[in-house]
From Swiss-Prot:
The lineage of its organism: Bacteria, Pseudomonadati, Pseudomonadota, Gammaproteobacteria, Enterobacterales. GO terms for biological process: fatty acid biosynthetic process; phospholipid biosynthetic process. Belongs to the PlsX family. This is Phosphate acyltransferase. GO terms for molecular function: phosphate:acyl-[acyl carrier protein] acyltransferase activity. The gene is plsX.
Length: 359
């Protein structure tokens, strides 16, 4: 394994350095080839490194940034006032080649806007999308995008997301000829928003995409598709609803419950079932797949959940390591031309629609 360097926006997220710094130390323990640039306020970060040993400190560097973008800041205002913030400095380290990826739990809209401004989208991509890989009940994985980077998406953007998701599923996850579906409120052709129906017509004309039609939200974890595409608003609500249900389910499995006194053998059976079911469904724990890749950029950016705990943020760091090692941006770029060559214009309602981003 070759050495790699990541830039962490340690000031971002609901809990800031109290979570991100311990998670950084956890990541260093797990990967001896990793170097981390901790971007933020040195006066806050330094005391949290008191437990770091000499070997860990040799692979850590604090990069000063005195301000932070608030989680509730409007993206446009945050971007205009972003100079010197921990998020922007972390992204600039990637742009300058001092780091190979950036990890942030900060403001999603600001991260997307700054990443697009500083790192630039790949040729043929209009806007990046947040993507994650979720486990499903068939013991496989499903690529899901967009998860919140773009609230409003037209049909062309949805098709671009489908292209990127399919390439990611094939090149990184290892799924041959991945099935691609659009998230919708029904499977009938007449269902859904105009943008979804138009995207469906367009995807049917792309010969290199294995498009299978619409999928409803209740089938997200069934394994019926390898890539699920939606706008950022729908994707974010769907993901967080699923996370909430899974957390509640796992919590119920672990709880002792209430009720009358039971015999010792019933209590023993209950505890055995709790442990067995908890192990069986532990792979669905949202902490284990925290970290959404901002797909479609010329560099690697990982967005952690704002409410991530130490374990979850450490997982996001590992996601960044894997994305760099698997050369995700390079592989996406290499495949885009073969997926829809320059000038390719599929038809939807009789009008030519160019899938390539207009520059």
């Amino acid at each position: 394994m070759t050495r790699l360097t990541l830039a962490l926006d340690v000031m971002g997220g609901d809990f800031g350095p109290s979570v991100t710094v311990p998670a950084a130390l956890q990541a260093l323990n797990a990967n001896s080839q990793l170097t981390l640039l901790l971007v933020g306020n040195p006066d806050i970060i330094t005391p949290l490194l008191a437990k770091a040993d000499f070997e860990q400190r040799s692979r850590l560097q604090i990069i000063p940034a005195q301000s932070v973008i608030a989680s509730d800041a409007r993206p446009s205002q945050a971007i205009r006032a972003s100079r010197g913030t921990s998020m922007r400095v972390a992204l600039e380290l990637v742009k300058e080649g001092r780091a190979e990826a950036c990890v942030s739990a900060g403001n999603t809209g600001a991260l997307m806007g700054l990443a697009k401004l500083l790192l630039k989208p790949l040729e043929g991509i209009e806007r990046p999308a947040l993507v994650t890989v979720l486990p499903h009940q068939q013991k496989g994985k499903t690529v899901v995008l967009d998860l919140g980077a773009n609230v409003d998406c037209d049909s062309t953007m949805l098709v671009q997301f489908a292209v990127m998701g399919a390439v990611l599923a094939e090149e990184v996850v290892g799924i041959k000829n991945p099935r691609v579906a659009l998230l919708n409120i029904g499977e009938e052709e007449t269902k859904g928003l105009d943008s979804i129906r138009e995207a469906s017509l367009m995807l049917k004309t792309v010969p290199t995409i294995n498009y299978i039609g619409y999928l409803e939200a209740n089938e997200l974890l069934t394994g019926k598709t390898d890539v699920l595409v939606c706008d950022g608003f729908t994707g974010n609500v769907t993901l967080k609803t699923m996370e909430g249900v899974v957390r509640m389910f796992l919590s119920l499995l672990k709880s002792q419950g209430e009720g009358k006194k039971r015999s010792w053998w019933l209590l023993l059976l209950k505890r055995w079932l709790q442990k067995s079911l908890t192990r069986r469904f532990s792979h669905l724990n949202p902490d284990q797949y925290n970290g959404a890749c901002l797909l479609g950029l010329r560099g690697t950016v990982i967005k952690s959940h704002g409410a991530a705990n130490q374990r979850a943020f450490a997982v996001a760091i590992e996601q960044a390591v894997q994305a760099v090692q698997r050369q995700v941006p390079q592989r996406i770029a290499a495949r885009l031309e073969s997926v829809y060559p320059a000038g390719f214009e599929p038809l939807d309602d009789g009008k030519g629609v160019n899938l390539r981003a207009h520059r």
